[in-house]
């Protein structure tokens, strides 16, 4: 589940795994965390996934799915608190313009980022619910890019990850949007390991 609108990683995974080996499911959910949560819960019931991969802001929604192993790419654990604080900015037209300037919609994005005060206020409870959903015996593993520009702003925080999951992560020499070489060398082998797939 991608955050924002980027679907490059799941689309690339689809090309790497034949459908008879692994079905990669890509769905677009709402930026409103409550609406998105209801959509995702319905899809989980329908698809019955064996693995959930959360990217960026999508990591927060992924954490709320229980009973399956989790992998994460650039999990944005610091985002809910920052988005909640940004709700005040979203009360003003200039503030909404600023937020869209900071997080622009790119061509091909699947998810519309709706920076309204009402929606952003929901992210505090959304983040708290995600942490509360962590299972003591669950499987959680993450990948962080050393050149991830969101680490400077506190959106992506390895210290927060370590607080809840310890050292269950790998850093790679790339950006927030995992490059294909690291998808192939790091993410794919971990997927195979978790699902018990042969090479």
Regions found by a protein language model. Give the residues of each.
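Short hydrophobic segments within beta-strands
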Residues: 1, 53, 143-145
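Residue-level marker for beta-strand->alpha-helix junctions and adjacent short loops that shape enzyme
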Residues: 2-3, 59, 77-78
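The alpha/beta-hydrolase serine catalytic core
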Residues: 69-71, 75-198
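Active-site catalytic motif of lipid deacylating hydrolases and related acyltransferases
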Residues: 1-46
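Short, highly selective alpha-helical patches that border small-molecule cofactor pockets
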Residues: 6-14, 62, 153-158
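Gly/Ala-rich beta-loop-alpha elbow adjacent to hydrolase catalytic centers
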Residues: 52-63
């Amino acid at each position: 589940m991608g955050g924002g609108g980027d679907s490059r990683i799941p689309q690339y995974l689809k090309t790497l795994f034949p459908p008879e080996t692994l079905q990669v499911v890509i769905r677009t959910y709402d930026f409103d965390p409550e609406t998105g949560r209801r959509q995702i819960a319905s899809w989980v019931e329908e698809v019955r996934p064996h693995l959930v991969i959360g990217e960026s802001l999508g990591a927060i929604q992924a954490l709320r799915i229980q009973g399956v192993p989790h992998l994460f790419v650039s999990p944005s654990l610091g985002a809910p608190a920052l988005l909640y604080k940004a709700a005040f900015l979203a009360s003003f037209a200039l503030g909404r313009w600023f937020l869209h300037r900071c997080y622009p919609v790119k061509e091909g994005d699947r998810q519309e980022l709706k920076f309204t005060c009402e929606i952003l206020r929901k992210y505090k409870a959304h983040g708290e619910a995600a942490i509360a959903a962590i299972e003591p015996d669950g499987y959680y593993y993450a990948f962080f890019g050393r050149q991830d520009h969101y680490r400077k702003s506190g959106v992506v925080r390895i210290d927060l990850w370590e607080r809840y999951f310890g050292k269950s992560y790998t850093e790679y020499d790339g950006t927030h949007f995992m490059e294909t070489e690291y998808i192939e060398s790091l993410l794919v082998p971990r997927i195979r390991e978790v699902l018990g797939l042969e090479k």
